[in-house]
Structure formats: C-alpha cells, structure tokens
Amino acid sequence: MNIQALLSDKVSQALIAAGAPADCEAQVRQSAKAQFGDYQANGVMAVAKKLGMQPRQLAERVVELLDLTGIASKIEIAGPGFINIFLDRQWVAEKVEYALTAPKLGVAPVEPQTIVVDYSAPNVAKQMHVGHLRSTIIGDAAVRTLAFLGHNVIRANHVGDWGTQFGMLIAYLEKMQNENASDMGLSDLELFYQQAKKTYDEDEEFALRARAYVVKLQSGDEYCRQMWRKLVDITMAQNQVAYDRLNVTLTKDDVMGESLYNAMLPEIVADLKAKGLAVESEGATVVYLDEYKNKDGEPMGVIIQKKDGGYLYTTTDIACAKYRYETLGADRILYYIDSRQHQHLMQAWTIVRKAGYVPESVPLEHHMFGMMLGKDGKPFKTRSGGTVKLSDLLDEAVERAGKLIAEKNPDMPADELKQVINAVGIGAVKYADLSKSRTTDYIFDWDNMLALDGNTAPYMQYAYTRVVSVFRRAGVDETSLTLPLVITEDREAALATRLLQFEEIITTVAREGTPHVMCSYLYDLAGLFSSFYEHCQILNAESEEIRQSRLKLAMLTAKTLKQGLDTLGIQTVERM
C-alpha cells in the first residue's frame, strides 16, 4: 500500500481538473508534524505561478475537486496554499488488517525488471579489508530490497582476477615447489604475494620468468591457467567465509571477474576504431571525449589500448557494461563502487553510450559511497597504520558484543548465546555503516555502534525482542486475533500510519540505493511503538476488541521491523 502514490494520483487529478497542465506535480509528502496532517501536498504554489493565479485560490479549487471519500477524515489549506490531508482512522485500520495477512506486508507487486548489481569486488590473492565493507554491505542491502520487491536481480562480483601479478605468483609458487596450491589458505597466499613481489624486484631472472608466465597465461597455456584457477579458488573460498559471516547473499556463482571480458577486448577496440570513436595516438589507441577537458581545455584522451597491446580498466568496464546489457539482458545496472572511481566510470559509460552498446533507456547508475574513517577523521587503520583486515574487524565486533550480551544474560543457553552475540556484533558493524548516508564519509566508533540506545543495531534488535515478548506473555498468535481492528487513540493512529508507510520507504530505497532511509524509518517505527507500548495498555486493555486491536498493531510492528532489518541483511533475535 503506497499511500503517497495514491494521494499524489488523487491530488494530480484534482489539479488537472482545476486547469493545471497534465504534467503537473502534486508534491505529496509525509507531514513533518501531526498538526499538518498525515500528508501534505505542496505542488499548488508552483502550478499557481504557471497559471498566474493566487496559490490560495487554486488550493481552494483543488480541495473542492479532490475526492478522498473514505480515505481522509479532513482536508485543510494552510499558509499560502499547502493542502494538509488527515487520514481516516477507519481506512487506516482496514489497511493495517490487509497488511497483516497479505504477502510482503501488503507491498504491491512491481513490474519485474532484470537488474544487475555490481558490488564487493575484492582482489584475488589478497584478504578482504575494511575498504571492501561498504561496497559489500550497501550493495547487498540494495540486492535484498530489489529482490523483495520482485525484481530479477543478478549479483555481479567484479573480482580483480587478472593482471601481471599472476605471472609473478605462478613463478613464485613454482620456485617454492609448492604447486599443490589447494592446501594453502589465503593468509599464506598473501604472504606469498609479498615474498613474490620482493623476489620480482630483486631477481631479474625471476622477473623475466614471471613476465613470460603472464604472456603464457594470456595465451591460454593450460599449466598457467590451472595455477591461476587455484589462486582464484583459494581466494574466493576464503571470501565466502567473510560473506557468510556478514550475512551477505553473494556466492561463488556470482563471481564475474575481470577475466570474463578478456575475449571481448580486441573486438571492442576494433569496433571503436571502425566507428571512428577511437584513434591511434603515439602507438596507443585513444578515445577523445569532448565532454571531458584536460588542463589545456582540449578533449580528454581516454586510452583503451596501450602501445604494448595491453588493455586498461576502462576497456574492461566498457566490455562489462556491453555484456551486462547484451548477454544478461539488464534493464538497469547499478554499481556500488567508491566515489574516487566516479570520473573513470563516467568516461567508460560515455564511450559505451556513443558506441551504442547500452541504450539510454537502460540506466547505468554509480551508487557511490564515501570512506570509513577513524575517530581522528583519517582513513580507518590499525594502530600501526596498516590496513584493517575484515576478518579481524568482525572478530573484534563479536568479542565486544560477547561482553555486552553475556553480562546481561548469565542464564542463556550457550548455543543461543553464541547466536545472539554473533547477530548483535555483526549487525552492529553493518548497521553503523548502513544507517549513514552512503555518499558521505563516516566515523567508525565501537562505543556508538554497540550502544543499546540511539539508531544502532543493538537498539533495533532489542526493540524487536520487546515486541515479540508481548506475544510470549499473551500466549497468542495471529490466528487467535479474530476481532476487527479499531483505532481510538492518537498513539495507535501514529503507529498504524507509520506502519503503512513501509512501501513508500522500500520503494525509495530501491530507486535511490539509500539503505539509511530504511534505517531511519525503522528507528522511528521503534520509537513510535515504544510510546504506544508505554501509554496504551495492550494485555490489560479495557475491552477484548481493543486488546486484540493493539496486539494486531504490535504484530505488524514485529513483522515490519523483521522484514526491514532483513532487507538490510541484519538478523533479529527472539530475546537479548
């Protein structure tokens, strides 16, 4: 049930009937304060200006023509021409009843699209570090949201699995006579990487062999391909451990590494030349873009093939977009990559559009994000200034949550305690990130993220346990709530209306890729439930009808909190 969309449609119809153009915008928003109703239509002023009318006069005409029979109990005009809409409590009660029993909390089915989401993208032969966290969890929240709405979502893990470093690694493994790479863990592999690099820099003969292996690997040499495959498999097996711990939906089947596009690269370069988009310049192949200027004010040259015949990230990204449209059949393509890559992506996509590889009707969206910073406002590092490994961060989160939870639950069975600690620790790290606008940098702070009050995962998880505890105490389930829902108190109405706004919120998150909007909504919802719980007797209500009505509101609150947190990839627990 998307109330905002319903009211926008009704107000637009009234505006058009009052003489507004067909493309007018009703600008219906959720009201910031209860005195302004539940929703406010702000579009009258802009339309009145176009029509040369007094806004108040147009607002009066719109209200006369606005048919909200059975939906609104009152419509008021405020200020110069704001239209305040107060929802009818009986109508709200009926919609809550529907949401309780309908699939997906009453969220309307969408016209399904095929949406490719590019996220996580770790490198082979490297352990995941905190720099991979934002892309991984924000991208996964987007994936979960789109899938919940009914879209066909293709997860694309654009793994860094190609490049000159593989010749070096293969040569070093051979040198150490350790071809049985499957026995290695990723930590061994990372040490190998460092030792291989040192040997490469110091031993010219080794460096020559490494370079020869790069050529062999690129030419499809069976031995080199086998060794490369082992390196990729070891890395992805270890990364899967991190994904599982993070409750992220990526699997090995979602890996679409850089190597996937290798065969396309010569064709892309040849095609861009044939279309007159790419030209030779000092031995390299370059696309000059009028949209981007260099420091001399001339069109910027984007290299797609080096003088030595090698390809660049831009070439791969062009092939990647083409593949996602032509082979995967994407209707929309989202990239969760940090903001520093923005110009690079925009240049690649400009070439993609000019070449006609992806039509304008298919959006290419860079959902960029800022950095995770330490308390000093600098990029988050270890005390010694090194990169923080993701596994170490998650270990510390679980350890800190363990102290918090074990202290409060000395009698909880060990298995349940372990599950709760894990859900709270991992949830705290994820929620601290997801609750911030993705476009900004944010400060990583253990104390804030594990706090049991404020907009944190522990608070949200506790809010959920508080709601479900009502049903444990009442000894009832959904099937025993047979009386119709009635709303008599303001706090009931506020909670019920906010519950019905779930579809508006999840639609916004799906459109804009902004999980912090869901976090804010759930936090607000938890606060409204807390106020309702404190001021409205549930189990000892004055009548059975009111008791069941309030239990229904509590039940929809529990379902909405659980579903909302699930779209963020945050686990709920039954008690804390």
Swiss-Prot record:
Q: Does the keyword Ligase apply?
A: yes
- Which EC class is the enzyme in? ligase
How would you summarize the oligomeric state and partners of this protein? Monomer.
Q: Which UniProt keywords apply?
A: Aminoacyl-tRNA synthetase, ATP-binding, Cytoplasm, Ligase, Nucleotide-binding, Protein biosynthesis
Transport listed as a keyword: no
Q: Supply the InterPro entries for this chain.
A: aa-tRNA-synth_I_CS (IPR001412), Arg-tRNA-ligase (IPR001278), Arg-tRNA-synth_N (IPR005148), Arg-tRNA-synth_N_sf (IPR036695), ArgRS_core (IPR035684), DALR_anticod-bd (IPR008909), Rossmann-like_a/b/a_fold (IPR014729), tRNAsynth_Ia_anticodon-bd (IPR009080)
Which Gene Ontology BP annotations are present?
A: arginyl-tRNA aminoacylation
Q: What is this protein called?
A: Arginine--tRNA ligase
Pfam families named in the record:
Arg_tRNA_synt_N, DALR_1, tRNA-synt_1d
Subcellular location, in the record's words? Cytoplasm
- The UniProt entry lists the main location of this chain as cytoplasm
SMART domains reported for this sequence: Arg_tRNA_synt_N, DALR_1
The Enzyme Commission number assigned here is: 6.1.1.19
What GO MF annotations does this protein's record show?
arginine-tRNA ligase activity; ATP binding
UniProt motif ('HIGH' region) ranges: 122-132
Reactions this protein catalyses: tRNA(Arg) + L-arginine + ATP = L-arginyl-tRNA(Arg) + AMP + diphosphate
Q: Which GO terms describe its cellular component?
A: cytoplasm
Q: Which PROSITE patterns does the annotation name?
A: AA_TRNA_LIGASE_I (PS00178)
Which domain of life does the protein's organism represent? Bacteria
Describe the family membership recorded for this protein in Swiss-Prot or TrEMBL: Belongs to the class-I aminoacyl-tRNA synthetase family.
